């Protein structure tokens, strides 16, 4: 999580905060939550800063506003950049965390971060994720000393949220431009468009960078349905854990979803046609349930 490092001089004054996100829908790249906060006494001046919903602004204007708010001594800000691998891991885990809960946790993490800096937050405005009333109650139970306003289109209604929207959007855009691609053995280009599943440029990028065994580069969110569609018909993989459950060896009534549910095609060969996972195999392979496939 990144933020302005120093506690502002006005931290002991009653303050308000706005929170918004960028990158919730795209199939690739991080999801970013951003916040902006200031003394309530400065609230009337926010309108003169010309903040607006970041989606309605051109990139040049967003960058200009972002740099100006960073220089404003009456404003504080912080961001939480959630890696696409973290999103996929949480959403595909045995005990899944859905995207709404991930979003809620990120927003609450920002609030806690600013409170821990010694800022006296008394009001917070957020764009809703899920049901507004339920979200507001959840926030109020966690932070009873803060008055919460949770609303649809909050980034258009409240300048403090508009500022947070700009912080989140610019941070995500810069993160994508500077993203360090770990899969150095592949010829990966950065012409991935907006990252939204419906974007033709994004679709073409996914097709171009799809691997028949490993799927996609780590920039991609494997938990998105778009990935499931793209991975259908690729190399079949036999998962020993799935075979054990099909044989009735699973002890839990609530079993983990099979990897085949997420686009990884399961091999139809029975376990006896594959190298045995028992006697004769080294302990390293046995412990990790790694099997040799004789053919693809």
Swiss-Prot record:
EC number: 3.1.26.4
Signal peptide per UniProt: none
Binding locations of a divalent metal cation: 20-21, 127
Cofactor comment text: Manganese or magnesium. Binds 1 divalent metal ion per monomer in the absence of substrate. May bind a second metal ion after substrate binding.
Reactions performed catalytically: Endonucleolytic cleavage to 5'-phosphomonoester
Physiological role: Catalytic subunit of RNase HII, an endonuclease that specifically degrades the RNA of RNA:DNA hybrids. Participates in DNA replication, possibly by mediating the removal of lagging-strand Okazaki fragment RNA primers during DNA replication. Mediates the excision of single ribonucleotides from DNA:RNA duplexes.
Family: Belongs to the RNase HII family. Eukaryotic subfamily.
Identification of the protein by name: Ribonuclease H2 subunit A
